[in-house]
Amino acid sequence: MLDKRKFYINGKWVSPSKPNDLEVINPSNEDPYAVISLGSKEDIDKAVKAAKTAFESWKKTSKEERLKLLEKLLEVYKKRFNEMAKAISDEMGAPMDWATEVQTGSGQAHLEDFILRLKEFNFDEHFDSKSSNHICYEPIGVCGLITPWNWPINQIALKVVPALATGCTMILKPSEIAPISGMLFAEMIDEAGFPAGVFNLINGDGAGV
């Protein structure tokens, strides 16, 4: 059984504040195949503190700096594509071909699209050549992101990647029913070299987190 009890907070895999195990079930055979921890308020507080601290420097990064990291993330995602497909197949009980082509493929497609959109996006937009007025787009701050079990990496990519692209920091809580793909994505974030605290992950249920 996979031991996935730790959370990703401030660039490190850390143990929860208090033990609270939950088995992850493969719906295709109804067998447990992994164990995670359900987080608490104390864990959330640690992640929020890390995200708030990281935001002060992350919000000042240039578009080019964020693009470089997202392109590295895409490279890592492609390298570990089959791992992601296997994680999704197990946690959803989904056929491997569907988990690969539709589920994991959508995550890659969203990453590629957001990279393209970021390249095209102007964060400082003038109204017209005759006016000195302009719109300056700024990151909003720390984002709390919750994703469902049925389109795990699809929804993670749709929420996490644009937040990263715009200079926000975040805490992700994937579905406790299908959390392994999210934890693998956290490993990819780490491997890509994002600064500590920019992305944090805590597992948990609705009542606790």
Segments and roles (model prediction):
Residues 1-124, 128-131:
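N-terminal Rossmann-like NAD(P)+-binding subdomain of aldehyde/semialdehyde dehydrogenases
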Residues 123-209:
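Rossmann-like NAD(P) dinucleotide-binding subdomain of oxidoreductase/dehydrogenase enzymes
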